[in-house]
Amino acid sequence: VTGHKDPTPEEMEEALSKAKEDWVEARDRDEAIGIFLKAAAVAMDRGVFFVVKGPVVSVWTGFPEAVDEALKGVEIKLSEAPAIKGVIEGKNTYKGIGPASEGVFQDFYKGLGTAEAPKEVIICPVLINEQVISVFFGDNQPSGRSIKAQGYLGTLSRKLCMSLEVLILKKKIMEM
């Protein structure tokens, strides 16, 4: 549920609890990522999930649905995205002003439904075996709210990592 008000601690706890239950039952990575995005939507107006592919990140999915459809498959070179590159290299969350609305980001922001860079974004890494495999990019530009759920999104990101690691282990068990 994408909202235009800050979520209460109870709403975030309820979404996290539901996500944890769902991750235990997740059958594949798409389902695990969908669970993450649904829980992230409690605190964020928009979100995009990128997959790291060497020197580029590629949009995998996002919310709301219009963003997902507009951006699916869009690639951004890390050399043109210092904030995303910094998250990948440092394995830390970034919270701050959105990358400048020029070059590849101009098209990216149009896909998000805006012409200018968001005043504030959050970019969270998703790690498996200490390697960043993907990043979540979220903002509240439509409502103009500041991002106050950094801890919540970090917890979601860590739980997603665990869920993906369990899925990898299940696959290895079946292959042996």
What residue spans do the PLM features occupy?
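Allosteric cytosolic regulatory segments
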Residues: 154-161
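Regulatory sensory and allosteric helical modules in signal-transduction proteins
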Residues: 68-107, 173
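Signal-transmission linkers at sensory-effector interfaces
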Residues: 1-22
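Amphipathic alpha-helical coiled-coil segments that mediate homodimerization
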Residues: 15-23, 28-44, 49, 160
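GAF sensory/regulatory domain recognition
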Residues: 49-71
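Short hydrophobic beta-strand micro-motif common in sensory/regulatory domains
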Residues: 119-127
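Regulatory loop-to-helix N-cap segments in sensory/regulatory domains
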Residues: 140-154, 167, 171-176
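Short hydrophobic/glycine-rich mini-motifs in sensory/regulatory modules
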Residues: 126-136
